[in-house]
Amino acid sequence: MAKKVTAYIKLQVKAGSANPSPPVGPALGQHGVNIMEFCKAFNARTEKLEKGSPTPVVITVYSDRSFTFETKTPPAAFLLKKAAGIQSGSAKPNKDKVGKVTVAQLQEIAKTKEPDMTGADLDAKVRCIAGSARSMGLVVED
């Protein structure tokens, strides 16, 4: 018989640096999950990723307090900021432009995000990433 799922926990944790401090500790502790076991497993799974990149993770907690987790790709905003070489997006994206990205960079980001995105083909995913870039105040160049 399959184990009963008691909770799904969604977090964003920096790759390779999960520790029991907030937000990880309290989120897992209230569901009775072994926090250190998760931290060790998460850090081992994300050691190949760029250290410090925010990594979304979905943790499935079962009735016997065991867990499984699935890591996702970093957020598009993080990848766009890295590609444009900026610290943060524009507060007024319609008026103030803070950087530029090329279509080639957008295609690279879309390929990275492909497992987590919905869309008919790569071109549709590139358009989605381009929309995120424009909403951050980035100019998309050909």
From Swiss-Prot:
Pfam families: Ribosomal_L11, Ribosomal_L11_N. GO terms for molecular function: large ribosomal subunit rRNA binding; structural constituent of ribosome. GO terms for cellular component: cytosolic large ribosomal subunit. SMART domains: RL11. Keywords: Methylation, Ribonucleoprotein, Ribosomal protein, RNA-binding, rRNA-binding. One or more lysine residues are methylated. Gene3D superfamilies: Ribosomal protein L11, C-terminal domain, Ribosomal protein L11/L12, N-terminal domain. Part of the ribosomal stalk of the 50S ribosomal subunit. Interacts with L10 and the large rRNA to form the base of the stalk. L10 forms an elongated spine to which L12 dimers bind in a sequential fashion forming a multimeric L10(L12)X complex. PANTHER family: 60S RIBOSOMAL PROTEIN L12, LARGE RIBOSOMAL SUBUNIT PROTEIN UL11M. This is Large ribosomal subunit protein uL11.
